[in-house]
Amino acid sequence: IAKTLVAIAIPVVTSSIIFSLTNLIDAITIQNRLDGVISNNLDLIKSIYATQIAEAHVLDADLKDFLYGAYTLSLDFKNLIPSITTTLGVSAIPALSAAYAVKDKRALKSSVESVLRVGMIISLASGIGMGVLAEPILRMFYENGKSAPAISIAAPIMAAYGYTIFLMAISQPMTNMLQAVGKANVPVKSLTVGAVVKVVANYIFIGIP
């Protein structure tokens, strides 16, 4: 039993570590690339965000922090939908484990399809709403605060998250279900590939003004 638990626990823990490290590396690479692109294209960046910079009275030395702060406004809402769909995967673990133990493929298929169907409905509907209403939502929370000038920068980012959030919203339930049927090593591989792709994409695309 101990060996089985360890065999299951190691991939699960590894997945969590990779996810946390990816978020950390993501934050570091974004800020580093922002610093580089601003240093090399200061006048262009200032012309693109002239209105917001003037409204917030941003100095050249603070421009990177201002733009990164605008990006983080959208992050406040990014995890709302995945946090809901994650509970679907967790709630399905007992049924999936039981069906897998007795090799009931029909029950296994039914459980997986139900979780994915409900997860897609929730994530697509709420994601589209998040995309369409990105700026009104941000204004509702930040209109009267110091972050108000950054709303027009954060809104397109939040909209992009909204339209693609179903991918993130489905990934966690799928991870839970794979772990429930003894395939915990699969999420480790996919997370590793995703982390590498994300870091490379950050480096390439953030460097483009």
What do the predicted segments below correspond to?
Residues G131-I165:
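Interfacial segments at transmembrane-helix termini and the short loops linking adjacent helices
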Residues Y163-V193, Y203:
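Membrane-interface junctions at transmembrane-helix termini in multi-pass inner-membrane proteins
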Residues S74, T85-V102, T175:
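Helix-loop junctions and terminal segments of transmembrane helices
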Residues G69, A155, A184-N185:
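Residues that define the loop-to-transmembrane-helix transition and helix capping
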Residues I1-S16, V37:
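Interhelical loop/hinge segments that connect adjacent transmembrane helices in multipass membrane
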Residues A2, V6, T72, A92, ...:
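Interfacial transmembrane-helix starts/ends
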